[in-house]
Structures are given as structure tokens and as C-alpha cells.
Amino acid sequence: MTNSNKEYTSQLQLIKKHIKDLSFENPQSISLVNMDKSAKNINLDFSVISRAFDKNHVEVTLQIKCNCSHENKILFCLELDYLGFFKKLNIINIDDDTITKEAVEHLFPSAKSIIHDISQNGGFVTISLNKLDLNDMKKVN
């Protein structure tokens, strides 16, 4: 009897993850900071940068940019570069798409928490991110 439901084995081992760059800017006066926290336009942009470190390791950066505006005024800009350093477990068969998807699965939960906390502590609308659709993500090699 054979099992047709093969278990997926991860192709990457997370060695380290950390904030590479973080920026939160509030270009407006305090009067806009204290305004009602509803009816804002929030624009999110995600991208992934993958760079081979050597034949066994890869560095992947998840970039998240968030701009919040109200009535054509920028309330805040939040940018996060969250880096992961990974060991390739199956060097021969691993492709760039697999690296990107697995790396983002490792990095996104922590990046999501950082975005949430920074936006909340910045005094504005709290940004709560949902799971990413990795097929729509822009990849930069």
C-alpha cells in the first residue's frame, strides 16, 4: 500500500532573522495625529530580495512599505526590511520560487508583529496584516 499524500519537507533551515532597516515617519502636525482613527487610505507594498551568500546559504529580505494618508495628506510612512539567513537543505533540487516562498513563511509572522506594534505605538491606525498571497509578491533577485 502506498501513501499518495507525500509529506512536504522544508528546503530551508532558518539560521537567523533580524530587522535590517526600520523607518517610521510622521510628517504632519500633532493635530492630525490626534484625529479620528477611521477613514484612512492605507497602501501596502511587499517585495522580496533574495541573494545567494554561498552555494549552501541564502539571504532573503522581506520588504514591507506602508503609507497611510487622509484627505491627500500623508499621516505616516512605515518601512521595514526584515532579513533572514537560511541554509539550503536540498541544494540540488531547490529553485528560486521555493526559496522565496519558504523564506517568506519563516519571516512574515515576525514582520507582521513588528508592523502591528510600530503602527499602534505610532498613535495611528493599527496595521494588522493577513496572510500573504505569495503568487502576487514581487521578487527581486
Question: What does each model-identified segment do?
Answer:
Residues M1-N141:
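N-terminal intrinsically disordered, cationic/polar leader segments
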